[in-house]
């Protein structure tokens, strides 16, 4: 794959997306692809430091958004764009859709301001100076917020986002639905309320339909 591929995993906390990233990476490698695994916020030394601040320090929505896009710019420049230029498949746990869902829909931050930050941070970091980088495919793990909350309660100690009330995640889920409606060619909805094996089958079918894996008979 000479041009690489950029695949993002999205969904509210507790949707179960992160547990499927490694399995997809293994399947893609078995199919002959070189795969880069990364996450947001994070992926570089600078972005990981900003991640720690975002997850554990108290701040308002504007500060969150500024830190997220600063981390994203560094991540694109240092990790994502170089990997794509090498023809790799980049699997990223969250990207800009999460910012619109969490800071936009969840926190109520101005979507027009987020769009401006998006253009500023994501333009001119690749081979084409006027290109705004977006994913080739976004796998949206959709689950009722109540189900996600039950999963989180049984997991590790929650961070600042995971400890938000169900009402917050209901707004975030609506934000993801709005993003999916606005980019139907890029988004693929995965019903992650189903058992793990069925979720994995949905995931593989979507990726196979894009030509990155063999179709399952």
From Swiss-Prot:
Alphabetical GO biological process terms: dTDP biosynthetic process; dTTP biosynthetic process; dUDP biosynthetic process
Signal peptide bounds: none
Amino acids binding ATP: 11-18
Domain of life: Bacteria
EC numbers: 2.7.4.9
Substrates-to-products reaction catalysed: dTMP + ATP = dTDP + ADP
Keywords on record: ATP-binding, Kinase, Nucleotide biosynthesis, Nucleotide-binding, Transferase
Disulfide links within the chain: none
A single GO molecular function term of this UniProt record: ATP binding
Cellular component per GO, a single term: cytosol
Xref: Pfam families: Thymidylate_kin
The protein's enzyme class: transferase
Physiological role: Phosphorylation of dTMP to form dTDP in both de novo and salvage pathways of dTTP synthesis.
UniProt family annotation: Belongs to the thymidylate kinase family.
Matching PANTHER family: THYMIDYLATE KINASE, UMP-CMP KINASE 2, MITOCHONDRIAL
The name this protein goes by in its record: Thymidylate kinase
Record organism: Acidovorax sp. (strain JS42)
């Amino acid at each position: 794959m000479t041009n690489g591929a950029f695949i993002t995993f999205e969904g509210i906390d507790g949707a179960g997306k992160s547990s499927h990233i490694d399995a997809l990476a293994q399947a893609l490698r078995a199919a002959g692809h070189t795969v880069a695994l990364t996450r947001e916020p994070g992926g570089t030394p600078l972005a990981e430091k900003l991640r720690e601040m975002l997850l554990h320090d108290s701040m308002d929505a504007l500060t969150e958004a500024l830190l997220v896009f600063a981390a994203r710019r560094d991540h694109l420049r240092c990790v994502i764009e170089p990997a794509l230029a090498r023809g790799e498949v980049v699997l990223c746990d969250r990207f800009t859709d999460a910012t619109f869902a969490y800071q936009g829909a969840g926190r109520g931050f101005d979507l027009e301001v987020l769009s401006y930050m998006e253009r500023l941070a994501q333009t001119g970091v690749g081979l084409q100076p006027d290109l705004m980088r977006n994913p080739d495919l976004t796998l949206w793990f959709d689950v009722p917020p109540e189900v996600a909350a039950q999963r989180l309660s049984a997991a590790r100690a929650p961070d600042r986002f995971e400890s938000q009330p169900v009402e917050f995640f209901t707004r975030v889920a609506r934000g993801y639905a709005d993003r999916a409606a606005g980019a139907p060619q890029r988004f693929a909805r995965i019903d992650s309320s189903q058992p793990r094996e069925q979720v994995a089958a949905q995931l593989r079918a979507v990726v196979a339909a894009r030509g990155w894996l063999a179709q399952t008979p």
